[in-house]
């Protein structure tokens, strides 16, 4: 990170930075997420993986979750694929230099414990990992008509702290992708249901719109069916 941000660093490039003043233009930054992870390490004096394990993973019994290969059972790791035309190519497991931006390895079952905790104001099964006011701040829309980037349409999108509001503000959560991976974790604020979806094949950005109006919406419909039937899987 120092080599990326420092003007004398070997990874520094002025083209990596916008010329807009803060607040005038929105663009999600993985590097900024990595920087946030580093700030936690500086503030707490603990490595992010150790901090996460002590204050989040262990208390919530997320036993199949970790940042590094050494912290998980590799036998349970999904095989990742990359699409090349009409064929699938296996991708060997890989790590991320800026791992806080998306390198956590978990399961839907484990991540649901964290998601439920957030939806319950920072508490799950009697275990509190965040203050209510912290969760409220994280999930509060940060943009208003008075204060918003020029390239943001508030009817379609808003942002919390690492949380996005889409579908006209109806759904809040986060999505992301890397080679061989696409993930979704969203909560419908009107219907009061949430979904988590992991894919072990990369989803191209050009395919996202069609995916959201087909598979993504169908999964939410199925979640409503489970809720209405008072069943779970």
Question: Where is each model-derived feature located?
Answer:
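A small/polar active-site loop signature that marks catalytic segments
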Residues: 77-79
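Glycine-rich, acidic and aromatic/proline-enriched surface loops and short helix-turn segments
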Residues: 3-10, 54, 58-62, 83, ...
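Active-site-proximal loop and beta-strand segments within enzyme catalytic domains
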Residues: 1-30, 46, 82-88, 92
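Short, surface-exposed recognition loops and adjoining beta-strand edges that mediate ligand/DNA contacts
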Residues: 64-75
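Well-ordered alpha-helical segments within folded domains of soluble proteins
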Residues: 32-37, 112-113
């Amino acid at each position: 990170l120092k080599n990326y941000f420092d003007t004398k660093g070997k990874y520094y490039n002025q083209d990596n930075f916008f010329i807009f003043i803060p607040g005038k233009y929105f663009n999600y930054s993985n590097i900024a997420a990595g920087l946030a992870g580093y700030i936690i390490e500086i503030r707490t004096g603990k490595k992010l993986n150790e901090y996460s394990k002590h204050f989040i993973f262990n208390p919530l019994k997320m036993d199949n979750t970790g940042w590094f290969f050494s912290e998980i059972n590799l036998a349970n790791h999904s095989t990742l694929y990359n699409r090349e035309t009409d064929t699938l190519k296996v991708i060997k497991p890989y790590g991320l230099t800026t791992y806080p931006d998306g390198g956590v390895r978990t399961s839907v079952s484990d991540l649901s414990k964290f998601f439920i905790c957030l939806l319950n104001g920072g508490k799950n099964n009697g275990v509190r990992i965040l203050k209510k006011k912290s969760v409220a701040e994280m999930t509060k829309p940060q943009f208003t008509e008075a204060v918003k980037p020029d390239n943001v349409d508030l009817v379609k999108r808003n942002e919390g702290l690492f949380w996005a509001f889409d579908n006209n503000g109806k759904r809040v959560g986060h999505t992301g992708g890397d080679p061989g991976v696409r993930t979704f974790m969203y909560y419908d604020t009107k219907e009061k249901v949430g979904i988590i979806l992991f894919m072990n094949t990369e989803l191209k950005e050009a395919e996202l719109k069609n995916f959201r109006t087909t598979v993504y919406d169908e999964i939410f419909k199925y979640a409503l069916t489970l809720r209405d039937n008072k069943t779970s899987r």
